[in-house]
């Protein structure tokens, strides 16, 4: 009865002709796995469930490579500071944009709107602070003779706070034409003042490089260090409605002065045979978000009482911008991870809001009920809010089946109107040589995959309405069987015997259940045999592998070097070593042959074998003997 039941399951997963080794199921149901795919108009929550994303509207393209800074005035006009031509653009509430000012320096690194509606712009390198009126006419407001103008903030009294580098100075300027000496507010021991922010009580906050500090200056100018991060740079600061300060810290590898490296390609999901008994690696334990030993980006929440929490960190994702939720519960984070925008709450819960498919979300800000994002290296302005897309598409990562595979069924868990399609090909990255997307499947109970046999497979989900939600997708497949390989044979010196080590003791209930001991945290590493003295013994040990993960059986043969026919010594071996009694063989020169077969894991018509010959070796069991040579010669008492 058990055999009939198992066959029925196998037939359900693979209603096709057998052509391979062990069946496998590729399951995508975790946040980590889902984030490896492409989110086109979909959000991904903390459990990995996919749902329609906010509608992302492209408002304006500057034609510049970079948008370094942004600001909004009381009328809702948006100002964009760009590089590398020093241009500032203004975009009105209807999305109409135009060049507003063209400054002499390369980069407009900072923008701020004054109390009277004027625009302040900080430029770099060898920059100045400009005041720009409503007509776009720019005049020099302050020239501190500093290399970089990194940040600007308007104080409650109307004065302009200016963060600079490479000397880490903060200036406070109340009127045009002030000298650097008279306007110096605070000279830190840091190299750069990268970010500035002001709260409703008039406190000024400064984020530094290269010490990664957050400094607070009370209205009377008294400084106090709130945070000393192990990361190099405080890249952005945002004040929440409850007075909390959110600080984005970057590591040495991604700080402002460093070029942004291209993320490493995501490894492909590998084939996992359904009942292969290969040792399973222990799962990597989740790190505390307070463990910053390998962090690239970190977001801190500094509470009004001075305490601080880490609410987000990533060893892989580089973040560049923050915008505080007006609810007081967390921030939006703009990244260089496919231009993705994440939402993180104060308790550390993380959700992918949307993916812009741009290289970098350089600034994030809100106005009224909408959020705005600027991107680089195509300087664009986007808007999104509460309205959801009418249709979203999620494309999975690519499954690498390790060999050409026959596809079985695909089934999933969803709510609302969700359609699934598949495609396959033999190149690692989908291109024009792949098959077209299959016809849409709508029954989540599953259907046979129609994509052709290939090494790689991808699926996509189309979410057709606002109620659509996808939480899991499963793909069954059967990789083509690949012959095992015998990689090496070693013949040990005479008199060394090999014996198996005692097996690891396992609860008999686990053994009889048929479950993998690894499911119970029992790791059984392959153990090398014990070497013992055994007079006359000749031992051999070999290494072999099977790319399908099939269990292998071995046979050992031998022949004299001058013969052509091998004789069987032992078959159906499951261990990769064997010892023979050397006294059972006549003196001479011999060769071993090892064969490996995966027949135990495959139907007979698909089983494959491999073989390898050893180097010749000598058997010499005869005792040494002394024989006379020539006639003895006697001289006195000496004979030779």
Model-derived features: positions:
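Residue-level detector of Asp-centered blade-edge/turn motifs that repeat once per structural unit
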Residues: 72-75, 113-116, 154-157, 198-201, ...
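Short, conserved, GDST-rich strand-edge loop motifs in beta-rich repeat architectures
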Residues: 24-34, 250-294, 604
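Blade/loop signatures of beta-propeller domains
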Residues: 23-55, 130, 171, 215, ...
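A short loop-to-beta-strand structural motif that recurs across blades of beta-propeller domains
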Residues: 87-90, 127-131, 169-171, 213-215, ...
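Conserved beta-propeller blade signature
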Residues: 77-80, 118-121, 159-162, 203-206, ...
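Beta-strand-rich ligand- or partner-binding modules
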Residues: 22-24, 29-33, 38-41, 337, ...
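Surface loop/turn motifs at the tips and blade-to-blade linkers of beta-strand repeat domains
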Residues: 59-63, 100-104, 141-145, 185-189, ...
């Amino acid at each position: 009865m058990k055999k009939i039941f198992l066959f029925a399951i196998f037939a359900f997963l693979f209603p096709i002709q057998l052509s391979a080794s062990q069946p496998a199921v590729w399951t995508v149901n975790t946040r980590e796995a889902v984030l490896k795919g492409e989110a086109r108009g979909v959000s991904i929550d903390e459990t990995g469930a996919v749902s329609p994303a906010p509608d992302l509207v492209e408002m304006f393209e500057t034609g510049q490579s970079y948008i370094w800074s942004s600001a909004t005035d009381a009328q809702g006009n948006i100002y964009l500071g760009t590089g590398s031509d020093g241009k500032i653009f203004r975009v009105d509430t209807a999305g109409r944009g135009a060049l507003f000012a063209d400054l002499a320096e390369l980069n407009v690194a900072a923008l701020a709107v004054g109390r009277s509606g004027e625009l302040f712009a900080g430029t770099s390198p060898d920059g100045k602070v400009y005041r720009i009126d409503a007509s776009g006419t720019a005049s020099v407001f302050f020239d501190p003779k500093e290399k970089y103008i990194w940040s600007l903030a308007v104080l409650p009294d109307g004065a302009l706070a200016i963060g600079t580098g490479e000397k880490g100075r903060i200036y406070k300027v109340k009127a045009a034409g002030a000298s650097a000496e008279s306007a110096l507010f605070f000279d830190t021991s840091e190299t750069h003042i990268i970010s500035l922010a002001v709260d409703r009580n008039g406190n000024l906050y400064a984020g530094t490089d290269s010490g990664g500090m957050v400094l607070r200056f009370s209205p009377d100018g008294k400084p106090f260090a709130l945070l000393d991060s192990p990361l190099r740079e405080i890249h952005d600061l945002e004040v929440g409605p409850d007075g909390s300060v959110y600080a984005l810290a970057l590591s040495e590898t991604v700080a402002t002065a460093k070029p942004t490296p291209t993320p490493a390609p995501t490894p492909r999901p590998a084939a996992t045979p359904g009942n292969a008994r290969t040792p399973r690696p222990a799962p990597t334990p989740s790190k505390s978000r307070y463990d910053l030993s390998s962090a690239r980006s970190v977001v801190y929440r500094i509470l009004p009482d001075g305490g601080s929490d880490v609410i987000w960190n990533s060893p892989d994702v580089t973040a560049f911008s923050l915008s505080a939720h007006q609810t007081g519960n967390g921030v939006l984070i703009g990244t260089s991870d496919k231009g993705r925008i994440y939402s993180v709450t104060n308790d550390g819960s993380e959700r992918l809001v949307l993916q812009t498919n741009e290289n970098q979300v350089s600034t994030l800000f809100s106005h009224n009920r909408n959020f705005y994002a600027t991107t680089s290296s195509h300087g664009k302005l986007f808007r999104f809010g509460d309205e959801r897309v009418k249709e979203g598409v999620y494309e999975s990562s690519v499954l690498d089946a390790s060999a050409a595979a026959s596809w079985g069924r695909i089934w999933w868990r969803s709510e609302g109107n969700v359609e699934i399609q598949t495609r396959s090909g033999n190149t690692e990255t989908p291109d024009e040589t792949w098959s077209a997307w299959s016809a849409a499947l709508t029954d989540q109970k599953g259907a046979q995959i129609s994509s052709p046999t290939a090494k790689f497979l991808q699926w996509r989900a189309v979410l057709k309405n606002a109620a659509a939600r996808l939480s899991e997708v499963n793909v069954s497949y059967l990789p083509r069987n690949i012959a095992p390989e015998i990689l090496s044979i070693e013949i040990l010196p005479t008199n060394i015997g090999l014996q198996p080590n005692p097996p690891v003791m396992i609860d008999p209930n686990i053994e009889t259940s048929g479950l993998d001991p690894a499911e119970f945290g029992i790791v059984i590493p392959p153990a090398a045999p014990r070497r013992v003295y055994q007079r006359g013994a000749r031992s051999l040990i070999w290494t072999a592998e099977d790319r399908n993960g099939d269990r292998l059986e071995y046979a050992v043969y031998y022949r004299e070097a001058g013969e052509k026919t091998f004789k069987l010594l032992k078959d159906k071996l499951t261990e990769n070593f064997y010892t023979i009694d050397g006294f059972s063989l006549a003196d001479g020169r011999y060769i071993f042959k090892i064969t490996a077969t995966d027949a135990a894991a495959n139907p007979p018509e698909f089983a494959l074998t491999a073989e390898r010959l050893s180097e010749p070796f000598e058997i010499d069991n005869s005792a040494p003997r002394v024989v006379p040579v020539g006639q003895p010669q006697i001289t006195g008492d000496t004979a030779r």
